[in-house]
Structure formats: structure tokens, C-alpha cells
């Protein structure tokens, strides 16, 4: 593992080659990212080729079963560092015993007045590549300098949501957000993440009185998750996902998973999200 720094003026980011994981995001040397301490030892893992898990942690394909952990293997893998500063994870013996497909996943980090995280999924095989891809950045809660309630807000949508507890639950339920404003409470996360698929535009702002404003844009992603631990955790995750996790009780070939991306042989798909921080 090795740390790599990207910076432009006031904004700097550090990325670990282990997992291609964002480890630090600072504005004027003030840290806004969770420090990966207990009770959640991550800061911004890359979720691939799964989001959440499959029943029994087993992936099925062409009549075979493969053991694969929740959120996939990308976050626990050592990534190659390319000459242009991007990170790459490619199919190997270690991945094929979990996920029998030929792929390359490249992640780049660009810092201007915001951090942009770009993921390129390449299908190097001769059959469609099934996958889910997600970001999982965790931000400090409370934010530096905050003096009041924290909220995540957006312009339109979000009156209803979905949840995934042991798999994606069927149907929608009312959201605790009011008029595009979700005032954060730990109790909201007693049953895992709040999942939204209808926010327009695809951008949310996380802030509190006295604190900076963090705006996350996720135009290339279908779902946004908001999650924290319900107890003992000083962070909130704002997570862009390519799709929903497996529904409860799913028992089929990975290519039949509802919402799965199927990338044609030889093709590439790009997903980007950005984080902008405006000072208090």
C-alpha cells in the first residue's frame, strides 16, 4: 500500500493504493473525511463488482457458485498505480475464483475547485460483464465548526425511498425528508441506509450552521445512499451507486440480477462523481 497526494490550491486529497480508497479530503488543511477509526474502519471504499452482498455471499454464473464478500473485492485489493496517476485493478487468479470474468477497473482522482472521482469499467472478456459499482465516501459528522443540526438537502424528489436489510426490500416507504431537507438523526440508520433514486438534479448538499457546505454530484449513477451507524459513529456516508443491491431472496445467475450493469465485450463504461467544499 502507498499514499498518493492530489492537490490544487486550497483543496487536497490523499488516496491509498490499497483499495484505491480516498483517505483524506482537506480544504485549507481542515479534514472533512472520516478517519477510518472504529467502529467503521473505512473512509471511502470502492464497491465492485457488488453493492452490498448476495444471499449466502455466493455469486452464481453458468451453473457454478463462487464465494464473494459483501461489496465485492475491490476495496480489499492492492491496485496498480499507472503512469498518469490513475489506479487500476484487473482480473487475476485471485479475482476469478470469486468473479469469473475478465475486467479492468480504473479510478482517477482530479482536484480542481472540487474533487472528481472517475471510474472506467473495461470488459476484456468475450461475454457481457455483469457488475455493480459504487462510491462510499464517509464525511465527518459533526462537521468542523458546526454549531447545530446537520442536514442533507436537494432540489426535487426524495419523498419516498427504499431500504436494503438482508437484501433490497420490496416496495417503497415514506422518506423522513421534508421538502428536500433531511435533518440527520442516528435513529434513521437503525435499519441500514436510506436509498433514493429520484433526486433531481443528481446533487445533494451536506452542511450545518457554522460549517462548510459539501456538495456531491453523481450524474452517472442511478441511486444515492445515505448511511451511518446508528450508534457510536461520527460520520455519515453519501454513496453514489450504479444500481440497487440484490433483492431479498435472490437466487439466480448474476446476469439476471435486477439492475445489474451488463457491459458488452470490448466496451468501456465511465462513472464519475464530484465533491465540492465551500468554506463556512
Feature map (PLM): residue ranges:
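Acidic-aromatic substrate-binding/catalytic surfaces of carbohydrate-active enzymes
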Residues: 12-65
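Generic N-terminal segment detector
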Residues: 1-30, 255, 276-280
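Acidic/His-leaning functional-site neighborhoods
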Residues: 11, 27, 66, 71, ...
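Extended, loop-rich substrate-binding clefts of extracytoplasmic carbohydrate-active enzymes
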Residues: 64, 68-112
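Active-site/ligand-binding surface loops and adjacent short beta/alpha elements
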Residues: 130, 138-220
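Short Pro-Gly-centered flexible turn/kink motifs
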Residues: 59-66, 261-278
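Acidic, contiguous internal or C-terminal segments within carbohydrate-active enzymes
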Residues: 93-139, 144
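Beta-strand-rich interaction surfaces with strong enrichment in secreted/lumenal proteins
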Residues: 106-108, 258-263
Amino acid at each position: 500500500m502507498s499514499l498518493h497526494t492530489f492537490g490544487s490550491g486550497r483543496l487536497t486529497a490523499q488516496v491509498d493504493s490499497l483499495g484505491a480508497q480516498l483517505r483524506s479530503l482537506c480544504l485549507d488543511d481542515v479534514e472533512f473525511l472520516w478517519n477510518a477509526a472504529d467502529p467503521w474502519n473505512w473512509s471511502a471504499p470502492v464497491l465492485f463488482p457488488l453493492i452490498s452482498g448476495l444471499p449466502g455471499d455466493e455469486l452464481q454464473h453458468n451453473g457454478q457458485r463462487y464465494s464473494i464478500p459483501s461489496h465485492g473485492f475491490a476495496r480489499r485489493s492492492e491496485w496498480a498505480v499507472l503512469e498518469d496517476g490513475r489506479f487500476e485493478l484487473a482480473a487475476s487468479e485471485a479475482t476469478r475464483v470469486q468473479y469469473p470474468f475478465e475486467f479492468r477497473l480504473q479510478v482517477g482522482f482530479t482536484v480542481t475547485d472540487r474533487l472528481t472521482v472517475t471510474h472506467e469499467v473495461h470488459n476484456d472478456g468475450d461475454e457481457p460483464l455483469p457488475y455493480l459499482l459504487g462510491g462510499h465516501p464517509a464525511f465527518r459528522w459533526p462537521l468542523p465548526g458546526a454549531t447545530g443540526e446537520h442536514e442533507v438537502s436537494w432540489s426535487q424528489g426524495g419523498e419516498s425511498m427504499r431500504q436494503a436489510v438482508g437484501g433490497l426490500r420490496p416496495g417503497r416507504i415514506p422518506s423522513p425528508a421534508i421538502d428536500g431537507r433531511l435533518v440527520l438523526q442516528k435513529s434513521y440508520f437503525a435499519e441500514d441506509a436510506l436509498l433514493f433514486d429520484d433526486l433531481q438534479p443528481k446533487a445533494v448538499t451536506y452542511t450545518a450552521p457554522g460549517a462548510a457546505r459539501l456538495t456531491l454530484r453523481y450524474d452517472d449513477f442511478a441511486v444515492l445512499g445515505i448511511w451511518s451507524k446508528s450508534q457510536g459513529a461520527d460520520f455519515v456516508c453519501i454513496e453514489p451507486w450504479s444500481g440497487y443491491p440484490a433483492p431479498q431472496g435472490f437466487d439466480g445467475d448474476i446476469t439476471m440480477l435486477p439492475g445489474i450493469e451488463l457491459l458488452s465485450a470490448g466496451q468501456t463504461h465511465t462513472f464519475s462523481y464530484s465533491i465540492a467544499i465551500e468554506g463556512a
